[in-house]
């Protein structure tokens, strides 16, 4: 028998979350007197660990897909996706431009080197592009001072038949926090004033909390929701459920051993947990080699037999220990939910480990089998 651990992915939850985002944007558009933006469903990092092909089927109602890897983009085309695809980091070599041309893939353009490669290209089809502004995150994009010239260079490539539509995009650094995105939005507006083409500025956090930035009248807007489509929250202060989102990934395991621990005895590496009373301790078939955060400490939530309990001591490579006192009927073979449907929120587990839900979902180990939920 295989080791008792697996991840369940719910296509129903994926579809539901896309619908929630769409309805949220529709309401914002009505309030602003504008048109609802189009949605690029972000499926980078193997669809945040959920599987590219699975996400393709679930997000069939999205207007487009956004990702990083050109090979994943080609897989989407070969799997039958006919809508727009955007490469968020753009391309890296002249040979990549051949693939953009052959598979009708759109690209971000964020540096002069990419413009230079495009200027030397002779594609058989026009390539759509989004010229990226560095509005303050200082990651990718042209500076506000250089943006006008970069956009004009892209328009020249459009006139030369290399590029098709040319749009404007940026990425918000603080849409998930109290500072908000307004400071970057003002930089973006100033740098792009009077420039034509579609606009894309909203990530998951901005889509959920500041949808008016993409729902007002004027240019065609595209939003780029990612983590929220998978049922996790981009915010540390607001759970995904507050937006009506459902977890798409559930990590399940089992109790594979039970220990009777006496008062004063310790549990796990480093003896970091000492029992204050006699207690039952369950050994779970999941560890940090499966993608569970090693830094999660005693008290991290976990569910056994449908009952909330807690992690005890340090997480091992292949196992972890949990408190079975709240679950007196649980023994070997009892089902365990580490995160997801019927268990703790992935963001709560991540917070206990000093990280974010994004990391847990994308770091699920290859040795963990992944199944579709029925």
Swiss-Prot record:
GO terms for cellular component: cytosol. Its EC number is 5.1.1.1. Substrate binds at residues 139, 317. GO terms for biological process: D-alanine biosynthetic process. Gene3D superfamilies: Alanine racemase (3.20.20.10), Lyase, Ornithine Decarboxylase, Chain A, domain 1 (2.40.37.10). Pfam families: Ala_racemase_C (PF00842), Ala_racemase_N (PF01168). InterPro entries: Ala_racemase, Ala_racemase/Decarboxylase_C, Ala_racemase_C, Ala_racemase_N, Ala_racemase_pyridoxalP-BS, PLP-binding_barrel. Coiled coil: none annotated. GO terms for molecular function: alanine racemase activity; pyridoxal phosphate binding. SUPFAM superfamilies: Alanine racemase C-terminal domain-like, PLP-binding barrel. Keywords: Isomerase, Pyridoxal phosphate. Pathway: Amino-acid biosynthesis; D-alanine biosynthesis; D-alanine from L-alanine: step 1/1. Its cofactor is pyridoxal 5'-phosphate. The active site is at 44 (proton acceptor), 269 (proton acceptor). It catalyses: L-alanine = D-alanine. It comes from the Bacteria. The modification N6-(pyridoxal phosphate)lysine is found at residue 44. It is an enzyme of class 5 (isomerase). Belongs to the alanine racemase family. NCBIfam families: alr. Catalyzes the interconversion of L-alanine and D-alanine. May also act on other amino acids. This is Alanine racemase. It comes from Bordetella avium (strain 197N).
